[in-house]
Amino acid sequence: MKKKILFLGGAKHQTAPLIYSKKKNYYVIVCDINADSPGKKYSDKFYNISISDKQKILEISKKEKINGIISYASEVGSTTQAFVGNKLGLPSNPLKSVQTLAYKNKFREFLKKNGFIYPKNKVFSNYTECNNFIKKSATLPVILKPVDASGSKGISTIENLKNLKEN
C-alpha cells in the first residue's frame, strides 16, 4: 500500500514536491482553497479547503490515515502542519516554535526576551485600540501589519488619521 502525504497548498510554486512525490510512488493529497489550484492535477485526491483550517485538516488527515504532512513554501500552512503533525505523532516541528516564527508579535517577544535587537512595535486586538493609540501616542507615519500575514501582505502606511480604516 502506498504511503500517503498530505500537502498544504497546491499553488504553482508548490508543485515541484507534488511531482517528485508522485514519481516516488506516494499517494498525494492536496488541500487548497483554490478549486483550480495547479497542484490539483498532480494529486491523487484533492480537498477544496483553506489550509489555515486546522481542525478540518486534522479531520481529513485522520480520515485519510496520512503518513506525513507538508507545508511547502507556505508560512500560512506551517502552523497547520505543526498542529496536525503534533496531534498525529508525525514528523513535525513543535507547534510553539512554529508559532513563534510565524506570528510577528510572538517573534518580537522572543527577540526581546533573548536580548536581540527588534523594531519598535505595538500589538492591537481591535480597531479601537489601534485608533486610540495612533491619536494619542504615535508619531505619523505609522506602518500597520497583521501579525499573521507573510511578506508584504496586509501592510498599510498611515500618514494621517483619515487613512486609518476599520478592516
Regions inferred by a protein language model and the residue ranges of each:
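Active-site nucleotide/adenylate-binding loops and adjacent lid/helix of ATP-dependent enzymes
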Residues: Y103-N167
